[in-house]
Amino acid sequence: MTTDVAPGTMENETSKVMSLKHKAAYVPPPIPHVEMNQLPLSLLLRNLTVFTAKEISQFFKLNVHTGGKTPFEKKLELLNMILFLRNQFLKLYVLVKWAKTLKQNNFHSLIDLLNWFRNANMQVNNCTMALKQILGTMAGAKLPNPDLATSLEVLMLGRPNLPNHGFNLNGSQSDNLTIPNKLILKRLRDLNTCLSIKISLMTIPSQLAKYEIKDGRIVFTVKDEFELQLSTIDQNSPLFFVNINLLFNERLPLNLARLEKHINEILFKSTNPLCLVYQFLHKYILTLQMYMIHVELNALGLNGKYSGGHLVHNYDSKKQIITIKYWLQSKIANTCKCVVGMDKETESIVLEWQNPDVNKETVTTRYHGLLNNIESIIDEITFNHAQMIRADLLRTDTFQEDNEDTTSTSLLFQIPTTCATVSQIQLKIDQVSGIFYFHNPSNLLLSYARQINQSSNTQDLITVLGRLKLDKVDSILRHMLDKTGWICSDVVRLKSSIVPSTDSTFSKDIFVKLKDWPSNWFLVLTIISSTNTCIVEKRIGKILSVKGVWKLKYMDKKNVITSKLDTMTYPKMLTLQISILNKIVNHMIIDSLNELKIKNKICTFTTEDSNILPPYIIRKDGKENTDNITVIALGLESFLEGSKALNTILESSMLLKIDYQKMDIELYGKFKTDNEMIRCQCDELSIKFLEEDSLSFFMSENFGNLNDIMLYLSKFRKKLTQLIALTDVMDTLHSNFQSMDFRVVELRPNEIRFKYLPMKDSPDNEDCVIRIVTNQEKVEKLDIKLSEHNPQAMIQRFLDEKEGFAHNFIFHYLQFTLPLFRASKEADYTSSSPSTVKMHLFMHSLQEFHFLYRNHKVGGELSFIIQLRSVVRTRHQENTQYFVRFAQDYSQPQLQQQHPLSKAIAEIQKNAFSLALLKEQNSNTTSSTTTAGTATAGATMISTASSNKLLDLQDSSPTNAAVDWSSIKCVRLGSALACSHDQILPLLLQFHKSISDC
C-alpha cells in the first residue's frame, strides 16, 4: 500500500522540525522550584484564628486587675488590638483574592521567580564584597608618591630603570653580595651633610629644637612625648619617616604603617612640614595619653583602691574629655567632680577639680603629669575635700579637734551618758567613699550614721547630731523614770512638739504618769537640747485620742518648771511623785471647770492672797501645812448656770478647798444677808454653818479616788442648787405668810411642808407641800400641793391646769384670797346663835369667785360675783383689789320687792353701793377715788403677767369683833364695789349679817 505525498510536503515538515530544534537549543533553563517554607491555606487560617483567640483571651485576663488604667484607656487598647487582628485577616483575604486572579492558580511561579531574583542579588552582593576586600589588601602595593618618570619607564621598558649600585639585578647569582663598608660610611656622611643643609633651610618649631643628626638620619626628641627619626635620599628629595619611639610608654603598640603614611604625606605636601608633623604627633600623643588615663581609671575603679562603685568616670573620645566623679555615696559633698582635658595655654593634659567651695589660693585645683600618677592625685583631692568638710563642721562649734588623730580626718563631739556626765564620740570621714562613720559605734550611733550620710549640707548634719543627742537624753530620762516608778507612755504621739524646734534647738516630749493618776492626765517632760546646753521643762497636760489622733486638750502654760539636765537625779524624781500629784488634781479640776464654762482661779498662799482668803480657810498662825492644800475660787453664777436668785442670796464667788493629806474636799459659800434658811435645819443637805461667820457655810466630802473629785463637785452643785431654791422659797414664804399661824413643819432638800392656817380652819398637819423638781444642774419647777382639808383646796385644780405660775405669785394669791375662804367659818364664829344662812363659795377662775348666801328661814338666795382686778394708783404703782357686785341686777324696784331677801338687798344697796354714803365715808380720799374712777375702763382681770406686781399683803388677825357698815371702807366703781384685802372679809361678814336679819 502506497501513500501519495503532495509535492513539497516532506520538505516543509523537515524545515519546521529543524526550526523547532534550533529554537529549543536557545530555551533558557527553568526557574528552580521552591517548596520550603510553604504552608497550606487551611493551616494558615487555623494558625491565625488560634492566635486571634489567644490574644483576645490574654488581653481580658491581663486587664481584669489593672487598677492604674482608666476605662477609656482599656477600651482604646482593645480597639487597637482588634484593628491589628483585622488587618491580619485582611492581608490573608487579599492574598487569597490575588491568587484566584492568576490563570490556573499558578502563583507558585511568582514565588519561584522572587526566590531566583533574591539569589541573583545575593551573588552580585558577594562579588561586590569580594572586590572591596581585594582593594583593601592591595593598599601596600601602591607607590607612596606618584612618580611619572618611573611609571613611564615601566610602561615603555616593562621595569623601572633604577641605579644598581654594583648589584646584579638580572637575577643571576654573584659572589659579591655585600655592600662595601666604605660605601656605607660615605653614604651616611653624605646623608648627614645633606640633612644638615636641608634642616638649616627649614623652619623648626620650638618643640623640635632639640635634635641630633647621625647615621644618616635626624632624630627629634620632645621630652615626655616622643623621639622621631627622619631621613632623606638626596638634596632634592623630601624628608621621609624612619621610626618613632614613645618616651612615656615604650611598650605601647603602635600602627607604624599608618603613622608612616600620614607623616610622609605631611612631609611631602606641606610647605612647613616640621610644624605640621609636630602638631600631628602632639595631638596623637595627647590622645594616647588620654586613652591611657582612661585605662588607668578603669583599673582603679574596678580592681584598685576605689573599687566598689566609689569612683566612676566617663571618657568622651570625640571631645577628648574625661569626667571623674568620686564619693558617690556622700551627699554632704555637693560637688565631687574632676575633669581631665586639654589645656589650651600649655597644650597639655590637666586635671581640674571643679568645686566652687574650695579656696583656690590655698588649695591646688589644677594638676599636671597625670599619666601613671592619677591615683595619688585623686587621693590628694579627696583628702583636701575631707579637710574642707572638717573645717566647716569645726566652725559650727559643735565639734572639737581630735589632738590624738595624726591623719586629721576625725572630729570629736559630746553626748551625755548620764544626766551628769558626757562622753567624747569620734566621727571620721572615709576618704575613699566619703561617708561618715563612728569609732566603736553602738546601735544608736549606727542608726544615726545612716542619717548623717543622708545629710545634704552641714546644717542637716548638725540637725541629725542634735536629734542624736536628743534621743540619747530621751533614753537616759526614760531609764531614770522607769527605775523610779514612773510609767512612760510610748503610745501617745502629738503631731507637733509642745515647744517647737528651731535651727539651734531640738525638742522632744516624754509623757509620763503614775499608776493611780486620773486617766488621760500626764506629766509632760519637754527636752530642749542645743549644742552646749540641755534643759527639761515639766508641764501638766491632758491628752485624748480623738478618732485615732492624739490631741492636747489642756496644758498648764503658766506653772512651767525648768531644770537643767545635770540637776535631774533619782531622789528628785522620787520627790516629784509626791509634789506633782496635787498639781495634777488641781489642773484636772480646772480643766473640768473650764469645760463646764465655770469661772475659776487658783488661790496661792502668798501674802496678797492670804489677806483675801477668810481665816477659816487657812489658819494664819503657820501651824497648818499648805503644801497639801489647794484653794480654788469659783464664780457662783457660772457654777450654777445663772440662777435668778443668785444676786440676792449668795456672794458672787465660792471657795473650793482640797486637802490631799486628809483626802477631803470642801466647798465654802456665804449668804449676802441674814435669811430664814440660816435658822432652819436640813440634815439631808449636809450643809454646816461656821461659828466664825454666821452667814458662811460649807459642804464637805471625803474622796478615796482622785477620779471621783469631779463627782463630788457635781454633788456640791446639786446641793447648792437645792439650797438656793430652798432659801428663795423660804424667804418668799416668810414674806407672804407673816401670820402667827405660819410655821414650817418639815424641811427637806426637795420638799417643804408648812402650815399657814389656824387649826380651827384646817386639822391637817400641813396645809401645803412644795416639791422642788430639779435635774442635775438646775431647778426645773416647783410643784405646790394643797392639803385635802385646806379651805383653799379648790384652787389646786386651776394651778394644775395651767403650769408656769411663779411661786411668788402663788404664795401671794393664797394669802390674798384667804379671806374669801375664811368668810364662812368666820361668820359662824361671830354669830351667837345657830345661823340660818349658809355661805357657798364657787370658783369660776383664778380671777373670779361666786358667793352664794342661802337663807333657809325665808327660803331666799343672794349671789355676789367677786373679781380680782389690777387698779392703777399712780404712774408707777399698781394695786390689786376685790371688785364685788350682785350676780343679778336689782336696780328695778319690782325685782327688789319680789325677792325674799329684799330687805337685805335694800340694806346692802343703801350701805355698800350708795354714792352719798360712799362720798361721806371717803371724803378724805377724793383724789384717790377720782383716779380710781378714771381707771375703771382700764381695770382688767388679774393674770399671770401681773402676778409679780402684786403688793405685799399682810394677813390680819382673826376677826372676832363685831363689824358694822361704818367700819368698812370701799370705793364705788360703776356697778361694782372695790375694796382691799383688809376690807373683803368684814364686807362679806356684813353681807352675811344683813341676810341673816331678814
From Swiss-Prot:
Keywords for the protein's UniProt record, in alphabetical order: Activator, Nucleus, Transcription, Transcription regulation
Signal peptide (from-to): none
Any single biological process term in GO: regulation of transcription by RNA polymerase II
Gene Ontology annotations for the cellular component aspect, listed alphabetically: core mediator complex; mediator complex
Origin organism lineage: Eukaryota, Fungi, Dikarya, Ascomycota, Saccharomycotina
Subcellular location: Nucleus
GO MF term list: transcription coregulator activity
Protein's job: Component of the Mediator complex, a coactivator involved in the regulated transcription of nearly all RNA polymerase II-dependent genes. Mediator functions as a bridge to convey information from gene-specific regulatory proteins to the basal RNA polymerase II transcription machinery. Mediator is recruited to promoters by direct interactions with regulatory proteins and serves as a scaffold for the assembly of a functional preinitiation complex with RNA polymerase II and the general transcription factors.
Name of the molecule in the record: Mediator of RNA polymerase II transcription subunit 14
Recorded family membership: Belongs to the Mediator complex subunit 14 family.
Top-rank taxon: Eukaryota
Predominant place of localization: nucleus
Organism of provenance: Kluyveromyces lactis (strain ATCC 8585 / CBS 2359 / DSM 70799 / NBRC 1267 / NRRL Y-1140 / WM37) (Yeast)
Quaternary state and interactors: Component of the Mediator complex.
